[in-house]
């Protein structure tokens, strides 16, 4: 029996999320998944994310070693991977990540995304040049979200 985490077996997580929804206003699911160093979201990740959302998860936050897409599925934000914020792996793409912050404003909810980098064991805001911003946005933008640049060098979207 797995005692450190819960399997992504739908027979396990679906009833668990349903039960959590009965007693909680908001359910955030954090998942470690995907192929290391791969920016593309796998079919399996997408299937599991949609199943988690259908089970009632309000937000899904995934982890992989690199940044992956952000999707809005049936008003459930899915951050497939926030990237890597703890390792000084020699691959530069593994030293990039993002912090997400949610703001509730009546019926409109908004997420703020701040690009970060890890260098010499320290995490800081990633002060990107124009090309880096284009790459970052292309790495995370999915057709299901209207991603907008903000005045702080990050991004926002409503759902």
Where do the protein language model's features map onto the residues?
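Acidic, metal/ion-coordinating pockets
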Residues: 1-159
